[in-house]
């Protein structure tokens, strides 16, 4: 299935409530998911405008075999998008017969509404507002290149490097070809919001990862040293996993689980392109993974980013016919799963640090889940005080909630996110070496006084000469 047919199928699925926009994109068989996702989002955003232009131009009357959703995608590409990709084939020829009329109807619509720009035709709720003011964050994949080399590459392409940002105001002021280094993450570059790098050669080669800053924080706060064993409990689509691998320098082991086969297949492609070699992928429900399994006996770090309502995702603002505000029943079901997954993760015997994160804004999925887990593991785990200067903290729903982090477009210029870092409050005893029950204690482990007594006894048992 080609790009335009795949985009039309996703639009039809969203409209008929077969699933969310992102979920339908991931379940498609199209190879370039990011390209498909971007095209569907933009077509959806201009949906009302495209319907008006198509109707007034009489396109569907003239082309009776052309389905409405495919027509919408094609007209978006012709009038508002990047032009037909890969030559466009028969679709370019088909739309070419109506190009003059379609352009005339778009111009007439602008005159009728008294606007000059395409985006001014959008409804207020669909215009580039707060969601489109969030900068474009680009993580340099240190498994393949260094931040300074990526910066030099962009400079040679005509971008103007402005150095390391010192405040959010520096990020808000970005425009044109300017870019910065993030003030917190040393491998994160920041570009103006509308910068599109999906076709950039460094991105296509896996040297760059297009990842929102808030999505980078869980791996950064987990911070496993090279050589560590790590579990990524709900791993797909894999951006966080690839960041963990970069922090490990591909030294150690990542056990990555996800029960969605299609998402896991897409993840396999992503981590391979990123040069990840220390990750073991498994199509498995994390709740079925046994903490007593010897394969995970050395796991000291767990990242748990479970399924959630996604209410903090910027893309939700584009899903006009999507799932909308999660219902009370759905929130309860999600929170129940999240609670089970978190308590399950805290049972791994060697665990020292766990990061729980969601892209949700709902208290039920965030502070409430964390509070319940702390109560069930009182005295064993506590919340770690992290990033004390981070401006947006957890809701004041329980003592210590200020150690949680929240993120939002308004306060941190990122997508909406929630993060809590658990650390073990007790020392895990080192297992004693295995010895035969009939063997005497190793001499090196006998206290000095006892050792002398044993030596004396041993001497008295020597044969006399």
From Swiss-Prot:
Q: Share an example GO biological-process annotation for this protein.
A: oligodendrocyte development
Instruction: List all membrane-crossing ranges.
Output: none
**Short name of any one Pfam family annotated for the protein:** Methyltr_RsmB-F
Q: Which residues carry this modification: N-acetylglycine?
A: 2
Q: InterPro entries given for it?
A: MeTrfase_RsmB-F_NOP2_cat, MeTrfase_RsmB-F_NOP2_dom, NSUN5_7_fdxn-like, NSUN5_RCM1_N, RCMT, SAM-dependent_MTases_sf
**Glycoprotein keyword on record:** no
User: According to its record, what are the GO cellular component terms?
Assistant: nucleolus; nucleoplasm
Knockout consequences: Decreased body weight and lean mass without alterations in food intake. Adult mice show spatial cognitive deficits, possibly caused by defects in development and function of oligodendrocyte precursor cells. Mice display a reduction of the corpus callosum with a decline in the number of myelinated axons and loose myelin sheath. They also show impaired development of the cerebral cortex, characterized by impaired growth of radial glial scaffold.
Q: Where in the cell is it found?
A: Nucleus, Nucleolus
Q: What does this protein do?
A: S-adenosyl-L-methionine-dependent methyltransferase that specifically methylates the C(5) position of cytosine 3438 (m5C3438) in 28S rRNA. m5C3782 promotes protein translation without affecting ribosome biogenesis and fidelity. Required for corpus callosum and cerebral cortex development.
State the name under which the record lists this protein.
28S rRNA (cytosine-C(5))-methyltransferase
Q: Which organism is it from?
A: Mus musculus (Mouse)
């Amino acid at each position: 299935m080609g790009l335009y047919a795949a985009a039309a199928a996703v639009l039809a699925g969203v409209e008929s409530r077969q699933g969310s926009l992102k979920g339908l994109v991931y379940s498609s068989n199209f190879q370039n998911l990011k390209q498909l996702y971007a095209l569907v989002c933009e077509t959806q955003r201009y949906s009302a405008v495209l319907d008006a232009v198509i109707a007034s131009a009489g396109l569907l009357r003239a082309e009776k075999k052309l389905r409405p959703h495919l027509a919408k995608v094609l007209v978006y590409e012709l009038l508002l998008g990047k032009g037909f990709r890969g030559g466009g084939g028969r679709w370019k020829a088909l739309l070419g017969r109506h190009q003059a009329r379609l352009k005339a109807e778009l111009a007439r619509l602008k005159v009728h509404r008294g606007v000059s720009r395409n985006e001014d035709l959008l409804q207020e709720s669909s215009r580039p507002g707060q969601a489109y003011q969030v900068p474009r964050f680009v993580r340099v994949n240190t498994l393949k290149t260094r931040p300074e080399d990526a910066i030099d590459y962009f400079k040679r392409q005509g971008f103007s490097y402005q150095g390391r940002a010192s405040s959010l105001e520096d990020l808000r002021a970005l425009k044109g070809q300017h870019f910065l280094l993030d003030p917190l993450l040393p491998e994160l570059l920041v570009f103006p919001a509308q910068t599109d790098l999906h076709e950039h050669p460094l991105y296509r080669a896996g040297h760059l990862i297009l990842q929102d800053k808030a999505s980078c924080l869980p791996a950064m706060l987990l911070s496993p040293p090279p050589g560590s064993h790590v579990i990524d409990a709900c791993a797909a689509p894999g951006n966080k996993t690839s960041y963990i691998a970069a922090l490990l320098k591909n030294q150690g082991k990542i056990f990555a689980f996800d029960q969605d086969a299609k998402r896991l297949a897409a993840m396999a492609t992503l981590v391979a392109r990123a040069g990840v070699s220390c990750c073991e992928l498994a199509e498995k429900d994390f709740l079925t993974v046994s903490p007593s399994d010897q394969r995970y006996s050395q796991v000291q770090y767990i990242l748990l980013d479970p399924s959630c309502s996604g209410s903090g995702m910027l893309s939700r603002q584009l899903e006009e016919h999507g799932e909308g505000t999660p219902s009370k029943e759905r929130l309860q079901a999600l929170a129940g799963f999240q609670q089970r997954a978190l308590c399950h993760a805290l049972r791994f015997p060697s665990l020292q640090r766990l990061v729980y994160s969601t892209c949700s804004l709902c208290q039920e999925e965030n502070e409430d889940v964390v509070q319940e887990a702390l109560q069930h593991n009182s005295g064993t785990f506590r919340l770690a005080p992290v990033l004390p200067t981070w401006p947006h903290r957890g809701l004041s729903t329980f003592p210590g909630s200020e150690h949680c982090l929240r993120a939002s477009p308004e306060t941190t210029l990122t997508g909406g996110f929630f993060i809590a870092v658990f650390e073990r409050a007790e020392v895990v005893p080192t297992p004693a070496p295995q010895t035969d029950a009939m063997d005497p204690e190793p001499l090196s482990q006998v206290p000095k006084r006892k050792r002398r007594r044993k030596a004396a006894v041993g001497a008295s048992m020597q044969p006399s000469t």
